């Protein structure tokens, strides 16, 4: 058949799974401007409301004035500028680790770690609901790829016990991006320690949000010193862009030498690093942002439960409404959009068959009135049989 792309695209349309980017005409914050209309935005990952914070924006502008809008090269050529170094040192201190290394995206960080640490003869063990970048990194590493049931520490321990691999790496999300629940990191740390394995945690959705200082899930669960590899992103709780890996001096040196996604790509703009230095400090010091989030999460969950919606076991800003069919999830998303709310319907293959959902995300930029308005709109959709 060759490259029959039209057939593939037509099939995706029939499945109600055709993706299209919406062109936003303003910044992504509490509100979103789309097609000349302003919406309340409940699908951004800007959990702490830092993406449009005046101090963070000012730091970005000053960074661009001082360092230009591009780094000009990879880190190992001439693209590693002073703000990059300062941010790596700040992230290492923030996460209680010897060193940290910047990557352009979380996807590249995850691919870089696994392809640098693993090869044929090794094994990687992953939660079935891990992010696509973790799954791709495991497959690309050349290691034997094993998946265990979601959040099942006993199943993981059993797989580790049977493995005779040279190196064993367990990889999990700290907070799962589509369900919002947290991994049982204590169970995983114990399983790894009992079977000579390393634990890697992708805390993309925990950094900035969890822990009294925003240090993430490894701190809330008390396992930071038991997790050799920590990955975090800068574009969610911290409001900027990019990612980092934090760990021992030997780990970071290994990534510098062998992580192709670090070596062979242009460094992030120094202006982004400058802005992140400010957002990192604010995320650590401004506890009111996490307090606001906790209040909004509790209010939304109570209201959605009272309306009869099926919630996931999440206490994080990710609050999915489990709908079921792709058609119903899309219809509810569109109905809410007509009422002035922007919430994306998440469908397979991102989530499992029959588990399409509305991924509601809350931000410290939201007001209590915003959550109440969303709950009222959901109630109206029920009366309109949507």
From Swiss-Prot:
Any one of the GO BP annotations: biotin biosynthetic process
Entry EC no(s): 2.3.1.47
Cofactor(s) needed: pyridoxal 5'-phosphate
Keywords for the protein's UniProt record, in alphabetical order: Biotin biosynthesis, Pyridoxal phosphate, Transferase
Reaction equations catalysed: 6-carboxyhexanoyl-[ACP] + L-alanine + H(+) = (8S)-8-amino-7-oxononanoate + holo-[ACP] + CO2
Binding site for pyridoxal 5'-phosphate: 106-107, 177, 205, 233
Binding site for substrate: 19, 131, 350
Source taxon at top rank: Bacteria
Molecular function terms from GO: 8-amino-7-oxononanoate synthase activity; pyridoxal phosphate binding
Role summary: Catalyzes the decarboxylative condensation of pimeloyl-[acyl-carrier protein] and L-alanine to produce 8-amino-7-oxononanoate (AON), [acyl-carrier protein], and carbon dioxide.
Family: Belongs to the class-II pyridoxal-phosphate-dependent aminotransferase family. BioF subfamily.
Subunit structure: Homodimer.
Protein name: 8-amino-7-oxononanoate synthase
């Amino acid at each position: 058949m060759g490259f029959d792309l039209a057939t593939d695209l037509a099939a995706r349309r029939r499945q109600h799974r055709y993706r299209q980017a919406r062109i936003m005409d303003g910044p992504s914050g509490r509100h979103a401007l789309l097609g000349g209309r302003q919406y309340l935005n409940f699908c951004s990952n800007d959990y702490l409301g830092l993406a449009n914070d005046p101090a963070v924006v000012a730091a970005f502008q000053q960074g661009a004035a001082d360092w230009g809008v591009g780094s000009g090269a990879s880190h190992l050529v001439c693209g590693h500028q002073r703000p990059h170094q300062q941010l790596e040192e700040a992230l290492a201190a923030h996460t209680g680790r010897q060193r940290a290394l910047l990557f352009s995206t979380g996807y590249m960080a995850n691919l870089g770690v696994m392809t640098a640490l693993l090869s044929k003869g090794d094994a990687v063990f992953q939660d079935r609901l891990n992010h696509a970048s973790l799954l791709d990194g495991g497959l690309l590493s050349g290691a034997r790829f094993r998946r265990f049931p979601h959040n099942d520490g006993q199943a993981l321990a059993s797989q580790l016990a049977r493995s005779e691999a040279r190196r064993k790496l367990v990889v999990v999300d700290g907070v799962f991006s589509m369900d919002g629940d947290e991994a049982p990191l204590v169970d995983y740390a114990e399983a790894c320690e009992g079977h000579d394995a390393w634990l890697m945690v992708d805390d993309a959705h925990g950094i900035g949000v969890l822990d009294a200082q925003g240090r993430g899930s490894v701190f809330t669960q008390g396992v930071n010193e038991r997790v050799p590899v920590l990955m975090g992103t800068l574009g969610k709780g911290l409001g900027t862009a990019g990612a980092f890996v934090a760990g021992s001096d030997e780990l970071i040196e290994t990534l510098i030498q062998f992580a192709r996604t670090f070596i062979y790509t242009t460094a992030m703009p120094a202006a982004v690093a400058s802005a992140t230095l400010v957002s990192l400090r604010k995320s650590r010091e401004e506890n009111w942002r996490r307090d606001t989030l906790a209040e909004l999460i509790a209010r939304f969950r109570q209201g959605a439960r009272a309306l009869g919606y099926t919630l996931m076991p999440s206490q994080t800003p990710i609050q999915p409404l489990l709908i079921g069919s792709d058609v119903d999830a899309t219809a509810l998303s569109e109905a809410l959009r007509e009422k002035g709310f922007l919430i994306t319907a998440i469908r397979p293959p991102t989530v499992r068959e029959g588990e399409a959902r509305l991924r509601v995300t809350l931000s410290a930029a939201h007001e209590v009135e915003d959550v109440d308005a969303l709950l009222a709109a959901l109630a109206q959709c029920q009366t309109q049989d949507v």
